[in-house]
Design a protein with these regions (language model features):
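Extracellular/oxidizing-compartment recognition motifs
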Residues: 1-292, 300-301, 317-320, 337-345, ...
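The feature captures the catalytic groove of carbohydrate-active enzymes
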Residues: 107, 207, 287-289, 333-357, ...
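Acidic, mature catalytic/reactive cores of soluble proteins
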Residues: 180, 185-192, 261, 378-390, ...
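Structural helix-adjacent loops and short alpha-helical linkers that scaffold large soluble proteins
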Residues: 237-245, 267, 311-323, 327-334, ...
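Stable alpha-helical elements in mature extracytoplasmic
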Residues: 270, 301, 322, 357, ...
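Amphipathic, well-packed alpha-helical segments that form the structural scaffold of globular domains
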Residues: 275, 279-283, 324-327, 362, ...
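An alpha-helical repeat/solenoid feature that recognizes helix-turn-helix modules
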Residues: 298-304, 311, 354, 427-431
Length: 447
């Protein structure tokens, strides 16, 4: 959002990632300093999680939740005489295509500054998303660190590749001064192979930025995508210099609370790697990876890592939002906890993964001592245990359905599945956690 040419706030990727069929977050900003009598309010809309391909339907070129750009906004004005006015989105607002021709969380962004500016047209009313408009729970996603390239590599394949010296999640700033019509192609990757740029591990994710210049010298910054990367391949700038590029690391606004330093450089590097693994995967949702065509909130990953995350950072609000979304998903799935949250249409459940509904709230209580999270999530915890009990029935049906095992373990005779004793012990653990949670919250024994 902009007032005249000034960007409002410092957040990226709003309104963030959650089940848009159940709830839609709104954000508020103080624009007192930006607003003038002749000020123009502008909002730039991208595909985001709502309209772009995402999740396990990622090979389909359509959004899971919808295929329209939608905006609901209000400008609240209080005048010097005390009178108030609210200017809301309606058909008096005007729209037109921007210079951003394409955006996608997996595939990147395309910007073409040679596109002619189209005339303004009246906005039209559209059907609202299914979810209830809800005050934000997501922490702001903002830039926390910047990185300068450690080296400009000339690879054996003749490529120009920046080595940032550090893997991180975020975007970049690229200074360009090239003739009109020049095409600049930026690609990101995590490793080199035989000294050359490599990104085949990203599967279908293109993870790129394409720019067509109109000849204006400027700094390019992507708006509606993010990358997980260390290496950056750039084509179209023959006199490329290290000072032209800056890496911008962003993630949710969490605060470091735990530190440890040892006498071993290897152990210290391991601790640093763990913390950076957290930062890279805490972009609004606790994800499995920040770079390939997935980047989803896997519940098993989230619960296993949650104690470590709570030692390192203040993650209470971050996980509270994730759990709220999880409970919303359960409310329409009969208590079932999907493998990923938001589910993006995935309705399967399994032990360990679904156990996040009980384990994460309990860990939040143990680490932060706030019993309200147990009260807030108790229906979610209880419905998960009841779902397991229902599926198990009199014939131990819970043991016969698919459950993830040690992923790609070569000694597991049943592919990626776990053995039945795992389901039995995990079910007992969730029941014990739920019982302890209710006793802690209600301050009395329960039956």
């Amino acid at each position: 959002m902009y007032v005249d040419e000034k960007r409002v706030g410092d957040e990226y990727l709003t309104p963030y990632s959650n089940d848009y069929n159940e709830w839609v977050q709104y954000q508020t900003y103080d624009v007192t300093e930006e607003v003038s009598k002749q000020g123009m309010l502008r909002v730039l809309l991208g595909n985001g999680w709502y309209k772009a391909r995402f999740g396990f339907s990622a090979f389909e070129d359509k959004g899971f939740y919808g295929n329209e750009w939608k905006l609901i906004a209000e400008l609240h004005l209080t005048y010097a005489d005390g009178s108030e006015e609210v200017i809301g989105t309606d058909e008096s607002w005007q729209v037109r295509r921007s210079k951003i021709a394409f955006s996608n969380l997996y595939d990147g962004e395309h910007r073409d500054d040679t596109l002619s500016e189209l005339p303004l047209e009246k906005a039209v009313f559209c059907e609202a998303p299914k979810g209830e408009l809800t005050e934000r729970m997501s922490l702001p996603v903002t830039i926390h660190e910047t990185f300068e390239p450690k080296e400009l590599l000339h690879t054996p394949a003749g490529e120009l590749v920046f080595d940032m010296g550090q893997e991180f999640t975020g975007i970049f700033k690229l200074h360009v001064n090239v003739p009109a019509g020049t095409k600049i192609h930026v690609q990101t990757g995590e490793i080199l192979q035989r000294g050359n740029f490599y990104n085949d591990n990203l599967r279908s994710a293109k993870s790129e930025y394409i720019y067509i210049s109109d000849g204006t010298e400027m700094d390019l910054v992507p708006h509606f995508t993010f990358y997980g990367y260390r290496y950056v391949k750039i084509e179209g700038i023959p006199d490329l210099k290290k000072e032209d590029f800056t890496g911008l690391s962003y993630y949710s606004n969490i605060t470091a609370t735990g530190w440890m330093k040892t006498g071993s450089d290897l152990v210290n590097q391991l601790i640093s790697n763990v913390r950076w693994g957290l930062k890279c995967n805490f972009v609004d949702v606790p994800t499995d990876c920040p770079q390939r065509d997935e980047r989803m909130g896997w519940t098993g990953d989230a619960q296993v890592f949650s104690p470590t995350a709570m030692y390192l950072e203040d993650t209470y609000a971050f996980y509270a939002k994730y759990l709220y979304d999880m409970a919303k998903e359960q409310s329409v799935l009969g208590g079932k906890v999907p493998h990923v949250v938001p589910s993006c249409g995935v309705e399967d459940a399994a032990c360990v993964w679904g156990d996040a509904a009980c384990i994460i709230p309990w860990n939040l209580y143990l680490f932060y001592g706030d019993k309200s999270i147990l009260e807030d999530q108790f229906v979610s915890m209880k419905s998960w245990v009841e779902y397991i009990t229902k599926v198990d029935g009199d014939n131990h049906g819970w043991r016969s359905v698919f459950h993830f095992g040690d992923w790609l373990a070569l000694d597991n005779p049943v592919q990626a599945r776990s053995r039945s004793w795992v389901q039995r012990t995990r079910s007992l653990l969730q029941t014990c956690i739920m019982r302890s949670a209710q006793e802690s919250w209600q301050k009395r024994p329960v039956c």
